[in-house]
């Protein structure tokens, strides 16, 4: 995977796009899956908890696998996720099969999540471009697009298998491209194939000196995984971000229905507006998120908190929707910024394990967010429960000043590459 290779440069974005395709189809097809299994809401809700039960241990283990085998694992795991969706359709006619299939999907999803985030963070560090933010934007965009496509396909065919088979074709194809583009690339910046080393010898002397200086810095700090506690703190702050983001994404349509008597079609505007705003914010804000991470976290936290308060007290549907959009604008940039910032000082040989640590802790917030909101909604109503979401982003704001004290992240600077020379693997995707 080299910077001169189009598939190599595109690999992180293709990986996240495939991940988004799967989860867009998943969200749109949950009613069909429930009907196919022949279970009620309560039993189906319990079965869905197995997504997290499968994901968490897989997330913990995958980082070490990526560090040992290389970045091609990301494409392999994405392919496995696409296949897992089809297997779920085949085995979910009974409750036991449904639970086993969902557990397998959760494990494949959690493993893929860590692998593609490691791929994006590695590409970002090597190129100096906002790859993490833009990869997450690709995820948001493809979730929205694939959910609409899957909904249309499900309405036309009524077939759960047709929807997941179509998703598998796309996801497996993207996974294959990602695996091929990264087949000779490890997480270590200095692990260049012989051919790339020869090409690197043709680089200008100043560029080679820059690479040598970077290799020396990595060698000094590459003996062990630094600051495991610091990574867990970053993950904890990420859990607050995920809890807030998922609460809005899950409950925004319910808010418009319960508080403002919106029709189903109008209520569906809320999650669609949230996803669209999130994708645009990540795409447009990538450079600022990369260069000014702490300022980004503070600004995004303030916007998200203001959005939560506005949503909680909005007297009209229009203002409530404005609050949801503001919250999307704020929450969308929080976790990508945290992940990029937290992984920046990590030695290349440990980036997979560091990604596992941050992502696994943050995922706990993703799992807890809807339940936390549900308890608040039961106590005080859906609209006022958004004050509790604003409290989460307010707590995140209070935690931001701690982050710079956890370590000294390396500055990200774009690396120049001659257009007529094939760069070394140290110049990345």
Task: Enumerate the predicted regions with their spans.
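Helix-breaking motifs and short loop linkers at transmembrane-helix boundaries and internal kinks
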Residues: 38, 70, 91-96, 261, ...
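C-terminal transmembrane helical hairpin of 12-TM major facilitator-type secondary transporters
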Residues: 295-338
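Short amphipathic helix-loop junctions that connect adjacent transmembrane helices
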Residues: 28-42, 250-266
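Primarily marks hydrophobic transmembrane alpha-helices of the MFS/SLC 12-helix fold
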Residues: 72-75, 79, 297-298
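Interfacial helix-cap and linker-helix signal at transmembrane-aqueous boundaries
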Residues: 33-34, 65-66, 152-157, 256-257, ...
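Helix-loop-helix hairpin linking two adjacent transmembrane segments in secondary transporters
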Residues: 135-186
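Intracellular juxtamembrane helix-capping segments at the cytosolic ends
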Residues: 111-125, 333-346
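Helix-to-loop junctions at the C-terminal end of transmembrane segments
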Residues: 57-71, 154, 281-293, 377-378
């Amino acid at each position: 995977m080299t910077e001169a290779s189009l598939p190599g440069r595109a690999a992180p974005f293709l990986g996240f796009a495939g991940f988004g395709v799967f989860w867009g189809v998943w969200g749109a097809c949950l009613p069909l899956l429930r009907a196919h299994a022949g279970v009620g809401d309560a039993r189906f809700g319990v079965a869905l908890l197995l997504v997290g039960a499968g994901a968490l241990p897989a997330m913990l283990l995958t980082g070490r696998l990526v560090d040992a085998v290389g970045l091609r694992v990301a494409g392999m795991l994405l392919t496995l996720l696409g296949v897992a969706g089809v297997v779920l359709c085949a085995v979910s006619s009974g409750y036991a099969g449904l639970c086993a299939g969902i557990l397998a999907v959760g494990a494949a999803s959690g493993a893929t999540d860590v692998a593609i985030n490691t791929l994006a963070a590695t590409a970002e560090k090597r190129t100096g471009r906002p790859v993490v933010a833009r990869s997450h934007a690709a995820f948001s965009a493809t979730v929205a697009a694939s959910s609409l496509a899957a909904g249309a396909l499900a309405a036309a065919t009524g077939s759960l298998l047709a929807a997941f088979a179509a998703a598998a074709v796309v996801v497996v194809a993207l996974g294959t491209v990602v695996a091929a583009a990264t087949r000779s690339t490890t997480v270590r910046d200095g692990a260049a194939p012989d051919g790339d080393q020869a090409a690197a010898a043709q680089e200008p002397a100043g560029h080679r000196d820059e690479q040598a200086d970077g290799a020396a810095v990595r060698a000094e700090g590459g003996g062990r995984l630094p600051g495991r506690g610091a990574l867990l703190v970053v993950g904890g702050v990420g859990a607050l971000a995920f809890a807030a983001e998922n609460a809005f994404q899950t409950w925004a349509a319910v808010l418009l229905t319960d508080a403002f008597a919106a029709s189903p079609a109008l209520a569906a505007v809320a999650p669609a507006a949230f996803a669209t705003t999130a994708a645009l914010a990540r795409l447009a804000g990538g450079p600022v998120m990369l260069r000014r991470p702490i300022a980004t976290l503070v600004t995004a936290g303030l916007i998200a908190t203001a959005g939560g308060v506005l949503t909680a007290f909005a007297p009209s549907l229009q203002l409530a929707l404005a609050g949801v959009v503001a919250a999307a604008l704020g929450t969308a940039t929080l976790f990508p910024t945290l992940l990029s910032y937290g992984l920046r000082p990590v030695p290349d040989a440990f980036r997979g394990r560091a990604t596992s640590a941050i992502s696994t802790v943050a995922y706990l917030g993703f799992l807890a967010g809807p339940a936390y909101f549900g308890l608040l909604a039961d106590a005080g109503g859906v609209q006022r429960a958004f004050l509790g979401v604003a409290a989460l982003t307010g707590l995140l704001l209070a935690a931001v000043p701690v982050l710079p004290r956890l370590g000294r992240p390396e500055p990200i600077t774009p690396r120049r590459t001659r257009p007529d020379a094939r760069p070394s693997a140290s110049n990345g995707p």
